[in-house]
Amino acid sequence: MLRIEIQSRNGVAILHCSGRVVFGVEVEMLRSMATSRTEACVRIDLSRVEKIDATGLGLLVELQTWAWAKRKNLTYLDPSEHVWLLIILTKLYNSLEISYSDVIQFSGEIDDCGRQELIA
């Protein structure tokens, strides 16, 4: 199961993911949620992702390519230890924009209008 909580403020959308990014409805949901965002900056928080498979890693690359083509700024935030290990093993760190500090800068009080949640 994948849970995505969305925060949007000042032209920046953060998709907080928790659970599994694996082949099936989880990958399709993340793809749909990320590519439907109208903000110029999209952040995908991977700190609570417990499992990711080859399809999930492929989606990270696909979304990064999509963002470059659409001239959007896409950054992956705080990959969990499991996700980071696979990024290192597959040498995707050169292909993905990864940050460990943006979550702290963005955190703050969000009103209900800027918060959404989806579960698959």
Each predicted region: which residue ranges?
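STAS-like cytosolic regulatory interaction modules
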Residues: 1-51, 61-120
